[in-house]
Amino acid sequence: MDVKETILNIIQELFMEDVSEMMDEDLLHAGVLDSMGTVELIVELESRFNITVPVSEFGREDWNTANKIISGVVELMHA
């Protein structure tokens, strides 16, 4: 399973939402993520990908869509 597929599965598992058709939609504004959900997602991403997500960066514009989350994880994996 690739990074994109894994992240989409994580989001679906945690929030019961299939975001594969809304890859560029703001997940906070769409109601998929809230503050607690964001923490859950960070913990799961760190666990699954063996990365450290800077919490101060996660809620910003560069982590608000599925595509941006995928890009951020890939970047952290290669850091």
From Swiss-Prot:
UniProt KW Transcription regulation keyword: no
> What pathway is this protein a component of?
Cell wall biogenesis; lipoteichoic acid biosynthesis
Q: List the GO biological process terms.
A: cell wall organization; lipoteichoic acid biosynthetic process
Task: Note the superkingdom of the native organism.
Answer: Bacteria
Q: Could you tell me the keywords of this UniProt record?
A: Cell wall biogenesis/degradation, Cytoplasm, Phosphopantetheine, Phosphoprotein
Q: Which residues carry this modification: O-(pantetheine 4'-phosphoryl)serine?
A: S35
- Identify the main location: cytoplasm
InterPro entries in the cross-refs: ACP-like_sf, DltC, PP-bd_ACP
Q: A GO molecular-function term, please?
A: D-alanyl carrier activity
Location(s), subcellular: Cytoplasm
Look up keyword Ribonucleoprotein and say if it applies. no
The SS bond pairs are none
**Job of this protein:** Carrier protein involved in the D-alanylation of lipoteichoic acid (LTA). The loading of thioester-linked D-alanine onto DltC is catalyzed by D-alanine--D-alanyl carrier protein ligase DltA. The DltC-carried D-alanyl group is further transferred to cell membrane phosphatidylglycerol (PG) by forming an ester bond, probably catalyzed by DltD. D-alanylation of LTA plays an important role in modulating the properties of the cell wall in Gram-positive bacteria, influencing the net charge of the cell wall.
Query: Which NCBIfam families does its entry note?
Result: dltC, PRK05087.1
Q: What is this protein called?
A: D-alanyl carrier protein
Organism of this sequence: Streptococcus suis (strain 98HAH33)
